[in-house]
């Protein structure tokens, strides 16, 4: 029975070829960062408060003038079409049905216009953002931005933590690389997973990076598209280049992949409308800290001037509430469908159990921190002093 994200992960392990599951599930090198993301969240405990009227508990929030069903969204997932045909579209529709935003990845396998249209059919108010990698040829990025704007994407998310790709040792061991090459072991893997293999075969083609292909007329085959994606990212990209993107994009502009408070302050200074505290799910720098451990400092650095988002290790709605409690009071407040719906329900249930009606009522005194990050001792003491 699939009751939560961990159940879905176990199901995916059974149903997907190993090289596909490991690509999605794995991290960089020894995967210490990947494990830290979850372990550091688990080290935080929530302390309920009693005898509060929670009849009208509502996990909804308003961000950039739009109402979200809960403080969560779908982060960009590259190559999701490898997991299931039209995976990008399915994720977007699940987010639309749940009332939370979906961020489409640059290396997605469905046309960004088609994904947007499908989400709008599910919900005319669907929240959709576009993630952007900037490669050496900036004309590719410019075309993607123009297409996203024309299609109705409401926010642009510039990812800045992938100047080079992390060393994904699971992928190396599995021989998984782009362009993909079949080996005896992968052929056996495919034979042992006929359901997945049949679904891919029925597409009549391998998943391809269609949006990159349309941005580069020469990338007409999966091999050429893979070569395009694997080009070195633009290492000359600097904070000053946010002005270049601002000229192309008049909606909210977020910077994703920040872990240092100094970078958070620079994002504000250079006109970003939001930041995403992210270590790329532990898939880039294995020595990086968990996102929850640096989150309070990042929130302090922006001082309430822009929204702060975070990813990495979140598996339960209670994990989301822990993040809210960890940063409550640090700065002025500015205000696949089954998994997402479960997370929304989980957040609402956790609020009631804590004795809170809304997410902005979650406070430091709700958190007992057994984690050595800045402010954790204060949070623990606040919990002890409350009442």
Q: Which residues does each PLM region occupy?
A:
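Glycine/Thr-rich beta-alpha phosphate-binding loop at enzyme active sites
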Residues: 57, 78, 167-174, 178, ...
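Hydrophobic faces of well-ordered beta-strands that scaffold small-molecule active sites
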Residues: 72-75, 102-104, 128-132, 156, ...
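Glycine-rich beta-to-alpha transition loops that act as phosphate-gripper elements at the mouths
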Residues: 106-108, 135, 236, 254-261, ...
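Catalytic cores of alpha/beta
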Residues: 142-145, 259-271, 298-310, 314-325, ...
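Glycine-rich phosphate-binding active-site loops on the catalytic face of alpha/beta enzymes
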Residues: 160-166, 272-288, 320-338
């Amino acid at each position: 029975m699939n009751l939560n994200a961990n159940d879905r992960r176990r199901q995916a392990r059974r149903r997907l070829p190993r090289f596909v599951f490991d690509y999605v599930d794995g991290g960089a090198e020894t995967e210490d960062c990947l494990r830290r993301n979850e372990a550091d969240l688990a080290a935080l405990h929530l302390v309920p408060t009693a005898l509060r009227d929670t009849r009208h508990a509502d996990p909804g929030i308003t961000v950039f003038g739009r109402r979200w069903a809960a403080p969560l969204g779908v982060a960009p997932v590259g190559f999701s079409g490898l997991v299931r045909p039209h995976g990008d579209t399915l994720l977007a529709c699940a987010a639309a049905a749940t009332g939370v935003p979906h961020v489409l990845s640059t290396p997605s396998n469905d046309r960004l216009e088609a994904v947007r249209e499908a989400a709008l059919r599910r919900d005319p108010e669907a929240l959709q953002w576009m993630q952007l990698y900037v490669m050496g040829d900036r004309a590719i990025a410019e075309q993607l931005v123009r297409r996203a704007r024309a299609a109705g994407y409401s926010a642009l998310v510039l990812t800045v933590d992938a100047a080079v790709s992390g060393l994904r040792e699971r992928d190396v061991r599995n021989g998984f690389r782009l362009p993909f090459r079949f080996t005896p072991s992968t052929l056996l893997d495919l034979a042992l997973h006929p359901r997945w293999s049949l679904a891919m075969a029925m597409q009549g083609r391998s998943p391809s990076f269609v949006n990159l292909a349309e941005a580069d007329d020469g990338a007409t085959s999966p091999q050429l598209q893979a070569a395009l994606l694997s080009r070195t990212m633009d290492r000359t990209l600097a904070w000053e280049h946010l002005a270049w993107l601002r000229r192309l994009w008049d909606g909210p502009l977020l910077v994703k992949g920040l872990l240092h408070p100094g970078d958070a302050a620079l994002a504000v200074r250079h006109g970003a409308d939001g930041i995403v505290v992210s270590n790329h799910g532990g898939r880039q720098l294995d020595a990086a800290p968990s996102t929850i451990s640096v989150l309070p400092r990042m929130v302090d650095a922006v001082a309430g001037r822009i929204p702060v988002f975070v990813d990495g290790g979140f598996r339960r709605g209670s994990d989301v509430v822990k993040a809210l409690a960890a940063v409550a009071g640090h700065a002025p407040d500015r205000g696949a469908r089954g998994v997402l719906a479960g997370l929304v329900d989980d957040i609402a249930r956790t609020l009631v159990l804590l004795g809170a009606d809304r997410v902005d009522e979650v406070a430091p005194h709700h958190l007992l921190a057994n984690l050595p990050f800045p402010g954790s001792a204060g949070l623990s003491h606040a919990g002890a002093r409350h009442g």
